[in-house]
Design a protein with these regions (language model features):
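Helicase motor core with emphasis on the C-terminal RecA-like subdomain
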Residues: 1-183, 190-199
């Protein structure tokens, strides 16, 4: 705040809050198979009527689980980064306006989502980091006067999925050399260059 006041002549209003979310209740459940996970998810969703977010790690999982929930008579929609922008906006709007009770989403869902009545967040697979988990679980219980439940359903395959995804993001030595060669080639002609990652690729 001092920087903005001293350098930019702006007065900002400070909002402080306790970081402890005492209205959130955390539970971790081991489930040996995906079928066990799905039945547990169904039981959790059936035990409450509040809006719920189910987090998964892959777009296929979001689609598959949302579709299965709908076939079982629950009001669910998928949300992931591979969806067309209009479909994403529609799914989020329907969730925010309570036309859809359950959103099954990858981590692409949540930025800017402040829905006070989310009472259940289920991580169908473990999150890729503690920071992401805290942020995603924190979508529940935004109304501090209401209690909310946060569940993690996990099995041994969850970590393997994360290691596979992590390995897919690694650059090979050959790819690093190609990028380095492209940068050297461009800087040979100019002292300063401006280039996007797409141009280097």
């Amino acid at each position: 705040c001092d920087y903005f006041r001293d350098r930019l002549n702006m007065t900002l209003k400070r909002f402080t809050t306790d970081i402890a979310r005492t209205n959130l209740h955390y539970t971790v459940l081991f489930r040996a198979s995906d079928e066990d996970k799905y039945h547990t998810l169904r039981n959790l969703l059936d035990s409450t009527k509040c809006p719920a977010i189910v987090y998964v790690t892959r777009t296929k999982s979001a689609e598959k689980i949302a579709e299965r929930l709908c076939k079982d008579g629950l009001n669910a929609k998928a949300f992931h980064g591979q969806m067309e922008i209009n479909a994403k906006v529609k799914a989020q709007d329907e969730f925010m306006s309570n036309k859809v009770r359950i959103i099954v989403a990858t981590s692409a869902f949540g930025m800017g989502v402040d829905k006070s009545d989310v009472g259940l967040v289920v991580h169908y697979e473990i999150s890729d980091s503690l920071e992401n988990y805290i942020q995603e679980a924190g979508r529940a219980g935004r109304d501090v006067n209401s209690q909310a439940e946060c569940y993690v359903l996990y099995n041994d395959d969850d970590l393997n999925k994360h290691f596979i995804l992590l390995n897919q993001t690694k650059l090979t030595l050959s790819e690093i050399n190609q990028v380095w060669s492209a940068v050297k080639k461009l800087t040979a002609k100019h002292d300063t260059i401006y280039i996007s990652a797409l141009e280097i690729a």
